Regions:
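A cross-kingdom feature that marks ATP-driven nucleic-acid transaction machinery
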Residues: 1-103
């Protein structure tokens, strides 16, 4: 169970870095990073790759939580493309969350 949930935003010389959802589970040594997309079209795999790149390039996360596993989540109002579904099947650290999963 996450002990901290929030978002991450940094404005630096490279521009803005924003991660919509960040949750930390100290007991299981996991960090969850999520991207929210509430558009009229299904979300495609580049959204996941961009999120992963943001997390990989965010030194603060790695410094604050060394050795923690990172899980990724993509939230979508309109579902996912086949390419995104295939990407998730190949990656057990990627969760796809659609509108039906939300309370």
């Amino acid at each position: 169970v996450p002990s901290r949930i929030g978002s991450y935003w940094l404005n630096d010389f490279d521009g803005d870095t924003e991660i919509d959802v960040v949750a930390v589970d100290h007991q299981n040594r996991q960090v969850f990073a999520g991207e929210c997309k509430f558009h009229a079209k299904p979300v495609d795999a580049p959204v996941y790759f961009a999120l992963k790149e943001k997390v990989d390039n965010t030194a603060e996360i790695h410094k604050a939580f060394p050795g923690y596993d990172v899980l990724f989540g993509v939230f979508s109002k309109s579902g996912f493309t086949q390419r995104m579904l295939d990407t998730a099947k190949e990656n057990n650290r990627l969760l796809l969350i659609n509108e039906d999963h939300l309370a």
